[in-house]
Amino acid sequence: MRELVLFLAKTLVDQPDAVQVMETEGPEAIILELSVAQEDMGKVIGKQGRIAKAIRTVVKAATDKNAKPVFVEIQ
């Protein structure tokens, strides 16, 4: 799942080398923390959060039904 978020974010930004995804696995969920360059933050979030919501929807759709839920946080 980490690679999927990394791919999606790198295709959206002007500085793909600055994109990082940290994965934290807890007892009930997996949290993916996406960080990008400050200048690219608007491109990843989008107007009214539409791009961020789309990224979260794709990740949710790619998650197995019986697996832990995956949450994407953008920093």
What are these regions (language model features)?
Residues 1-41, 53, 57-75:
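RNA-contacting regions in translation and RNA-metabolism proteins
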